[in-house]
Curated annotation (Swiss-Prot):
Pfam families: Arginosuc_syn_C, Arginosuc_synth. Its EC number is 6.3.4.5. ATP binds at A8, Y9, S10, G11, G12, L13, D14, T15, S16, G115. The keyword Transport does not apply. GO terms for cellular component: cytoplasm. Belongs to the argininosuccinate synthase family. Type 1 subfamily. It catalyses: L-citrulline + L-aspartate + ATP = 2-(N(omega)-L-arginino)succinate + AMP + diphosphate + H(+). This is Argininosuccinate synthase. The lineage of its organism: Bacteria, Bacillati, Bacillota, Bacilli, Bacillales. One of its GO terms (biological process) is urea cycle.
């Protein structure tokens, strides 16, 4: 009896070529494809995997689990790698790894294969997550073992009649889920080259966007959006709805050169219309509900959490601790945020909360002012005392 290997199967170039390669190596291939909200035709993926020779193909709808258990933390934690990338692909990898391990254990497979190259982030994310969940499973990386270029993979696919939907003229590598879309390769590898129109799919060109804005209200509870325009939504459906609504206004385009885990720089094109709207709204609400010290310290945790996620360390003691901190800050992040969507911009123009720490009577400069301005004298004396003592000792700072 042949040994079984579970393959993370997307139906794209790398994993389609990997099916044939693993079969030629003498393994039975168990293909696994997760739906995490990318809008892919899963019936086609299922049939394609079996046509390629896989002995089984498991299609798993994980969209809700992805949104509730992973994307929710990206929202509560305002997660952005290098202040630019909202972790579109990185967020889905631990969930995919989790499901791969579950299928491997159910089918008595000896290991798990993926279609990642030897210089990308995903090889690390998958293999570290798999070892964290089941250290006895072997990892197989056919594309890394070949060391082939993308052109050589395409040639191999053409030679063996493997349908992959791309060619030498359009060699994009695309990854998509409900949190956004990532695109690389081809002309995008030149960081000075303007992305062609066909590099985008979720967002409209600015010249094609409506000349009338849309104004929406997002309602949050415990740091997560639960309503759009006062209508209840599950998180996954709310994100998908915002992707369409914000996308038509050209919102969410990111052209970013990022520092990969493997030490190289990579130019990536991201489209994250729903994510941009939600994250802006969430940050706006936090300005009302977080105390000053929490608001100033939380970004330190957010940065570490984003790097943990990007670097494939979701299943780790540190990440568990970071999640606990983030959750502890979100108890009172509840309220409404009003946002205008127009010409590539998501503009926050109002926010309110029952738990607001903003006191208009303390903030106002009108006669309704309740702030005790005379208290400022003593505060300034005490606050500035170290500076004053230093000046007495050293003669003060020169104006020169």
């Amino acid at each position: 009896m042949k040994e079984k290997i579970v393959l993370a199967y997307s139906g794209g170039l790398d994993t389609s070529v990997a099916v044939k390669w693993l079969i030629d190596k003498g393994y039975d291939v168990v293909a696994v494809c997760l739906d995490v909200g990318e809008g892919k035709d899963l019936d086609v993926v299922y049939s394609k995997a079996l046509d390629m020779g896989a002995v089984e193909c498991h299609i798993i709808d994980a969209t809700k689990e992805f949104s509730d258990d992973f994307v929710s933390y990206a929202i509560k934690g305002n997660l952005m790698y290098e202040n630019s990338y909202p972790l579109v692909s990185a967020l889905s990898r631990p969930l995919i790894a989790k499901k791969l391990v579950e299928i491997a254990e159910q089918t008595n497979s000896v290991g798990i294969a993926h279609g990642c190259t030897g210089k990308g982030n995903d090889q690390v994310r998958f293999e570290v997550a798999i070892k964290a969940l089941n250290p006895n499973l072997k990892a197989f990386a056919p594309v890394r073992e070949w060391g082939w270029s993308r052109e050589e993979e395409i040639d191999y696919a053409i030679k063996h009649n493997i349908p992959v939907g791309i060619n030498h003229d359009s060699p994009y590598s695309i990854d998509q889920n409900l949190w956004g879309r990532a695109n690389e390769c081809g002309i995008l590898e030149d960081p000075y080259a303007a992305p062609p129109k066909d590099a985008y799919d979720l967002t409209a060109e600015l010249e094609d966007t409506p000349d009338t804005p849309d104004e929406i209200i997002l309602s949050f509870k415990n740091g997560v959006p639960v309503q759009l325009n006062h209508q209840d939504y599950d998180l996954d459906q709310l994100i998908l709805t915002l992707n369409e609504l914000a996308g038509k206004h050209g919102i969410g385009r990111i052209d970013h050169v990022e520092n990969r885990l493997a030490g190289i720089k990579s130019r990536e094109i991201y489209e994250t219309p729903g994510a941009e709207v939600i994250l802006k709204a969430h940050k706006a609400l936090e300005t009302l509900t977080l105390t000053k010290d929490v608001a100033h310290f939380k970004p330190v945790i957010e940065k570490q959490f984003a790097e943990q996620t990007y670097n494939g360390l979701w299943f780790s003691p540190l990440t568990d601790s970071l999640k606990l901190f983030i959750d502890s800050t979100q108890q009172y992040v509840e309220g409404d945020v009003r946002i205008k969507l127009f010409k590539g911009n998501a503009i926050v123009n109002g926010r309110k909360s029952l738990y607001t720490l903003y006191d208009e009577k303390l903030a106002t400069y009108t006669k309704e002012d309740a702030f005790n301005q005379s208290a400022a004298v003593g505060f300034i004396d005490i606050y500035g005392l170290p500076t004053q003592v230093n000046a007495y000792l050293h003669g003060g700072y020169s104006n020169e």
